[in-house]
Amino acid sequence: MSVKPYIGRFAPSPSGELHFGSLIAALGSYLQARALKGQWLVRIEDIDPPREVPGAADAILRQLDHYGLHWDGEVLYQSQRHEAYREALAYLREHGLSYYCTCPRSRIQQLGGIYDGHCRALRHGPENAAVRLVQTHPVMAFTDKLRGDITADPALAREDFIIHRRDGLFAYNLAVVVDDHFQGVTEIVRGADLIEPTVRQISLYQQFGWQAPDYVHLPLVVNPDGNKLSKQNHAPPLPEGDPRPVLVEALAFLNQPVDDDWRALSTETLLRQAVEKWDLSAVPAAAAANPAFSNALR
């Protein structure tokens, strides 16, 4: 049996520029793909206009290029993929795998945050309604190539989750599965904050009859308060100067070796050596870093 060529990806949302936490996800996925002689794709997940920052998508691509993380092929923009998402929704609808839900958020909050399937048998129409997936065979666990077997919260795994929002926007879980399948992604390397929705995404793969990719969830960078470094927490953008000190700090965060003479290396050579020495098994499952570097190294 032939082995599928490796295809990895980095898929940021344009809600702001990349920060050190974003770099960890980008660098980890890049090194894994290059070490396995595979492709590394970039996708801009611009399906939530209210959260997007004008110019952020272009800024992200410039940052990746500045840090030597050069992608293969054309960048895919989710904003240009609406027809594919509509086709996916139609397929699920035609096969009885989705339904319209008019329950307000307040009702679900009263239930403790987990939806109870109230609208599944009510045959609502599309007006002022979200679309939910029928969880016929919920995925209760999956294997992470870094963390081993991960068991989901049973209530979360069984929930009929939203795949098309009431406001007309496509839900993240639907779009990411449709696009990863379309792009032939064989392994997803991303941050540990996305462990929770993984079982939902695998269940969507099964509903479509597609093979799910492998998963690797990297450790998250946290700020001194213990919160995930994020755009919402006002994480500073990556420095615009010499990328090498920041790349070295990112490699150290991922527990990867770096030569003492790295300052004599070009960015290209530094990354090439990082690819040659890449060891996924050395990456810690949990780690923390103080993002103050981004001010100190400007």
Swiss-Prot record:
Kindly list the positions annotated as binding ATP: 231
Documented EC number(s): 6.1.1.-
The record ties this protein, via InterPro entries, to: Glu-Q_tRNA(Asp)_Synthase, Glu/Gln-tRNA-synth, Glu/Gln-tRNA-synth_Ib_cat-dom, GluQ/Sye, Rossmann-like_a/b/a_fold
Instruction: Give start-end ranges for motif 'KMSKS' region.
Output: 228-232
Q: State its cofactor.
A: Zn(2+)
Which GO BP terms, alphabetically?
Answer: glutamyl-tRNA aminoacylation; tRNA modification
Q: What is this protein called?
A: Glutamyl-Q tRNA(Asp) synthetase
Specify the species: Cronobacter sakazakii (strain ATCC BAA-894)
